[in-house]
């Protein structure tokens, strides 16, 4: 476990120069007060009712991005998946739960209350869930994507099958 933590920490530090380079491209300061944040329906890859606010960059393109995700009250499961890029997550409000591995198992997860921070390297198999309204902030180097281990778990596939 200690080796894994060291490896993850090293990766997070390795990505810092890319984030700094992106920040140097900024031409003006940006401030987002809570009432200024524009929430839109979340991407189809996430549970129904999810909302997303893009704060910086474009998560669908190359380059640094920061987004906030809001999960509504109730149990919301995000099945085992990976990301092609490293991801950095801060819990803004509520509790975000994450577990590692190929099978969804809430007993093996870690509850992260507001104020928690988590980063993981590209390709790490994990799953997540919320039980009440939860807001997280994700930052990374795009393009951002989520790849479900079992395509049947991907909400995008369910929407394609709907009449």
Provide a role label for each language-model segment:
Residues 58-60, 102-123:
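Short acidic-glycine-tyrosine-enriched beta hairpin
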Residues 62-83, 111-112, 121-122:
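Conserved short histidine dyad/triad with adjacent acidic residue
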Residues 8-16:
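Bacterial N-terminal signal peptides
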Residues 22-65, 151-163:
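A short, N-terminal "cap"/entry segment at the start of jelly-roll beta-barrel domains
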Residues 28-30, 107, 127-163:
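Double-stranded beta-helix
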Residues 1-9:
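Bacterial N-terminal signal peptides that target proteins for export
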Residues 72-75, 82-103:
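Glycine- and acidic-residue-biased ligand/ion/polar-headgroup-sensing regions
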Residues 78-80, 98-99, 120, 125-131:
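Short beta-strand His + acidic residue motifs that chelate non-heme Fe in jelly-roll/DSBH
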